[in-house]
From Swiss-Prot:
Keywords: Chromosome, DNA-binding, Nucleosome core, Nucleus, Ubl conjugation. CDD domains: HFD_H2A (cd00074). One of its GO terms (biological process) is heterochromatin formation. Belongs to the histone H2A family. This is Histone H2A-beta, sperm. Transmembrane segments: none annotated. Core component of nucleosome. Nucleosomes wrap and compact DNA into chromatin, limiting DNA accessibility to the cellular machineries which require DNA as a template. Histones thereby play a central role in transcription regulation, DNA repair, DNA replication and chromosomal stability. DNA accessibility is regulated via a complex set of post-translational modifications of histones, also called histone code, and nucleosome remodeling.
């Protein structure tokens, strides 16, 4: 019986962030004795959403400053000017 091609968990979950790497970090980080199969997928999705949100705001900050490249200052401005991100 021919095996199907291996499919990465990230693409299976429709994510860009690496689910396997997040799973490894959860195991190695001594957070718990066991890590469920859904936990790294959920965490990777949350991290990807946060990264996208921050990059969107930083891109806007860069455009407001008439720049085509995001610099650390734009990231800082984006986070400081957003009420919820500023709380984190």
């Amino acid at each position: 019986k021919a095996k199907g091609k291996a499919k990465r968990r990230s693409s299976r979950a429709g994510l860009q962030f690496p689910v396997g790497r997040v799973h490894r970090f959860l195991r190695k980080g001594n957070y718990a004795n066991r890590v469920g199969a859904g936990a790294p997928v959920y965490l990777a999705a949350v991290l990807e959403y946060l990264a996208a949100e921050i990059l969107e705001l930083a891109g806007n900050a860069a455009r407001d400053n008439k720049k085509t490249r995001i610099i650390p200052r734009h990231l800082q401005l984006a986070i400081r000017n957003d009420e919820e991100l500023n709380k984190l």
